[in-house]
Amino acid sequence: MTRKKVREHLFKMLFLLDFYPKTELDDQVSTYLSDIGNDADAAEETQERLEKVREELKQKFYAVAEHLEEIDRKIEEKSNGWSLKRLAKADITALRLAIYEIQYDEDVPAGVAVNESVELAKVYGTDKSPAFVKGVLGSVVRDGAEE
């Protein structure tokens, strides 16, 4: 499974954050993870590789959830007066994923995090989502470079 596909699975998992109470998230994550491997993209994967992917997704999902308040504050700060309530859920999810990768995941270069989140916004967001996501993330990256 490609890194891009793994990131897309993480995006879909993170999308759950706004639709389920915290008490149900563990069950929702388990259900989602158990379905990985049942699609055509994973048909060629070994069970060992699928287990590694599932574990990585689970770890990253909970890492994002742990930093969610900080990440959401950063989104509101950088989205020029737009509250999270006014933003499209797909845009919020793409931003959460990228900001997590930029600020907390040393294995992902900032440019890759930005580009991949813009691509996710193209697929799952509105026509205006890619430009919005790129603008917010550009501001986040610039701030990080200044620190």
Language-model regions: role of each:
Residues M1-P130, K134-E147:
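N-terminal interaction/assembly modules
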